[in-house]
Swiss-Prot record:
Superkingdom: Eukaryota
Glycosylation sites: N85, N158
Sequence intervals crossing the membrane: none
Localization in the cell: Cytoplasmic vesicle, Secretory vesicle, Acrosome; Secreted; Cytoplasmic vesicle, Secretory vesicle, Acrosome membrane
Name recorded for this polypeptide: Zona pellucida-binding protein 1
Family label: Belongs to the zona pellucida-binding protein Sp38 family.
Entry keyword annotation includes Cell wall biogenesis/degradation: no
GO annotation terms (biological process): acrosome assembly; binding of sperm to zona pellucida
Location, primary (coarse class): cytoplasm
């Protein structure tokens, strides 16, 4: 019976429409310019492994002034910054660009500016402070749970079926550059209403979509990860609905292992990498970003928020 069902699932899968969508690498513009303030540290958000915007060593007022003999000196979390470092660019006018940004580059950056507005005047001094944070996009996925009427819980048929179901679901969404992973599978004895005990398999899967950096182009909206993930959800839901329809039309006896109608659930889940979290109050200019956890906070797992930890003194802490 179980083998008959697997054959049916494979036939259904082969009939499923193939959906292909590949995305080209987006060109990143670094033309954004960030101006400092003497009143408060300006927050700057830099995507991991990308270059920062142009970070200026001037205020809005000085930006439109002529500065005589300006001297710029940048300091970062590790001390003095110099263009001798391959990941640091400092222009003659004091503009800072950080390339291939890493987690450990997050922190407080200061620029000391010495200048004159009139040649005969003494030097003026100004210190501008920035808080620069690494961030990444949320890693989101669907969590899929489903139940099957099963063979006796000690039967190897259940294990074989679980592997085959994973393979089938993975193949179903492969053309979307998505993948399915088994989180856990459990067999339980279930007491039926006004009936005896029956064995049921409880499956939990995750459905994720990969970043696609290919040369083939397609419409951006159709290649976005959320769009592909929703499409994968539609294909999986259609697959289980189709299985119920075919079983209801069949005159054959029920197989030993079969999907229990109505048990499929797919829940959208957001997550950040360990050491990162979403906080729209603390980071209103990057409200949906997974921003590196500041000192006095941490995120130990793939959660969604940084948690308070008064003993943590570093950026990106994963332990307290």
């Amino acid at each position: 019976g179980g083998l008959l069902l697997l054959g049916l699932l494979i036939v259904l899968l082969q009939a499923a429409p193939a959906v292909q969508c590949l995305r080209s690498a987006e060109s990143r513009s670094n033309s954004l310019k960030i101006v400092g303030s003497i009143l408060f540290p300006v927050k700057v958000y830099v995507k991991l492994d990308h270059s920062s915007p142009h970070i200026l060593c001037v205020t809005n007022r000085l930006r439109n002034s002529e500065l005589i003999d300006p001297v710029f000196r940048w300091n970062g979390p590790s001390g003095y910054l110099s263009s001798a470092n391959s990941s640091v660019q400092i222009s003659p006018t004091g503009t800072l660009i950080l390339g291939h940004f890493r987690s450990d580059l997050s922190g407080v950056y200061t620029c000391s500016l010495v200048y004159k507005l009139i040649a005969a005047q003494p030097d003026k001094r100004l210190t501008i402070k920035y808080h620069i944070y690494a961030y990444s996009d949320p890693q989101y996925y669907y969590e899929l749970t489903v139940q099957y009427h099963a063979a006796p819980c000690n039967s190897f048929h259940n294990t074989s079926f679980g592997r085959a179901l994973l393979q089938i679901l993975s193949k179903l969404v492969a053309d979307l550059s998505c993948e399915v992973s088994l989180i856990k599978s459990e067999c339980h004895h279930v007491k039926m209403q006004r009936g005896g005990l029956q064995s049921e398999m409880f499956f939990k899967f995750s459905v994720t979509c990969l970043d696609t950096e290919n040369n083939k182009l397609c419409r951006q909206s159709a290649c976005d990860k959320p769009h592909r993930l929703h499409k994968a959800k539609d294909l999986i839901e259609r697959f289980f609905k189709r299985e119920v329809e075919i079983r209801k039309k069949s005159t054959e006896p029920l197989p030993e292992i079969y999907y229990i109608e109505g048990t499929l659930q797919m829940v959208w889940v957001d997550r950040c990498y360990p050491g990162y979290g979403i906080n729209a109050v603390r980071h209103p200019d990057c409200p949906e970003c997974c921003v590196i956890c500041s000192p006095r906070s941490y995120n130990p797992s793939n959660g969604i928020h940084c948690l308070q930890c008064d003993t943590s003194l570093i950026y990106g802490a994963t332990t307290c």
